[in-house]
């Protein structure tokens, strides 16, 4: 079982006292801290043209995280595939794979904001098909062999993407479930990729989608299951109070971007993993009981506008939780 932290979005809500320079410094500091407390991975999200400066350049941010650490995995959660030149994306991913010795995961997904499609010059109805073609091209590019490609959106004459990657078959690709949920799960499974379930979904829906993914994936070597979760760990304050303001801002921002009515954010309406260390250990063990050793449990403990000293402490406590869960799993093995 693995443990990660994220997603980091570097948002600056109205009235925030923290500059974007400070927010990016905070990301790198927390990446080093995550490694120090023996967490396994660190994840960065992507959006574009957001008034709060939501992180847009995930590839260079991952490069900075990988350069600041020695063991930590860094991944995109997710890069919007249709906004990238697929050959250049392949070259960038291979460079990160080489520089880090295999510690980069390329998470890919689709978009939904009209402003992003308009700004990038992409027709929304082509987004999912473009994702499929980008993955086709990446798979070929990562072989280090000559290939050509003729798709609906991308045409590539015979090329060889060099140098070849450090990781056999190229850096791992994770596909996100942000579109039509069943189709997303089936795509990831049929293509033999890791699957990222939308962290806002309730557990029964997560369980159903993972089962759907497993059926489509059947017959291949088992991959880890990256399960992203919202929550917080605190031993000296109410964890919901610690995350409520920033989480509310985040969820209501997503409502606005998705063209939905802006909803009240109540603790009981969300799948949250929060509490003191012992409470979070119990919750994580329940997830492990359900999904097994392949579980890669990723917890978001940083929220827009939050005092970074509080999320620093939450990362430390999350590292404690990870160590406690590992010991408990070891005892019961």
PLM feature spans:
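Active-site mouth loops of central-metabolism enzymes
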Residues: 11-24, 79-87, 169-180, 269-277
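N-terminal beta1-alpha1-beta2 module of alpha/beta enzyme domains
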Residues: 1-68, 73, 169-171
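Hydrophobic faces of well-ordered beta-strands that scaffold small-molecule active sites
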Residues: 3-7, 42-44, 74-76, 104-108, ...
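Conserved, mostly hydrophobic/aromatic
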Residues: 38, 46, 65, 96, ...
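An alpha-helical appendage that flanks or caps ligand/catalytic pockets
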Residues: 7, 36, 125-161, 204-296, ...
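Internal, glycine-rich beta/alpha segment that forms the wall or movable "lid"
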Residues: 82, 88-191, 204-211
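Glycine-rich, proline-tolerant flexible connector loops at the mouths of alpha/beta enzymes
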Residues: 41-62, 80, 199-201, 299-310
């Amino acid at each position: 079982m693995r443990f990660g932290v994220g997603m980091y979005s570097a948002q600056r809500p109205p009235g925030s006292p923290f500059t974007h320079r400070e927010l990016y410094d905070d990301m790198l500091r927390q990446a080093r801290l995550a490694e120090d407390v023996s967490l396994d991975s660190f994840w960065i999200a992507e959006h574009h043209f957001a008034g709060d400066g939501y992180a847009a350049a995930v590839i260079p941010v991952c490069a900075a995280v990988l350069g600041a650490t020695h063991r930590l995995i860094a991944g995109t959660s997710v890069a919007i595939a249709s906004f990238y030149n697929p050959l250049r994306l392949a070259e960038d991913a291979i460079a990160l794979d080489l520089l880090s010795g295999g510690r980069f995961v390329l998470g890919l997904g689709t978009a939904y904001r009209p402003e992003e499609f308009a700004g990038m010059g992409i027709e929304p109805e082509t987004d999912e098909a473009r994702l499929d073609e980008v993955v086709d091209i990446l798979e070929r590019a990562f072989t280090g062999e000559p290939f050509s490609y003729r798709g609906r959106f991308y045409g590539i004459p015979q090329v060889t993407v060099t140098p070849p990657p450090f990781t056999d078959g190229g850096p791992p690709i994770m596909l996100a479930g942000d579109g039509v949920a069943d189709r997303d799960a089936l795509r990831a499974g049929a293509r033999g990729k890791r699957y990222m379930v939308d962290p806002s979904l309730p557990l029964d829906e997560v369980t159903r989608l993972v089962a759907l993914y497993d059926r489509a994936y059947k017959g291949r070597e088992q991959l880890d299951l990256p399960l992203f979760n919202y929550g917080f760990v605190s031993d000296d304050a109410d964890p919901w109070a610690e995350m409520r303001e920033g989480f509310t801002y985040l969820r209501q921002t997503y409502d606005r971007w998705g063209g939905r009515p802006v909803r009240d954010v109540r603790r009981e309406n969300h799948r949250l993993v929060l509490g003191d260390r012992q409470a979070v250990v119990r919750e994580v063990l329940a997830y492990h009981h359900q999904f097994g050793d392949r579980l890669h449990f990723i917890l978001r403990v940083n929220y827009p506008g939050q005092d970074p000293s509080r999320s620093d402490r939450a990362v430390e406590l999350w590292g404690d939780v990870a160590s406690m869960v590992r010991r408990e799993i070891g005892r019961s093995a």
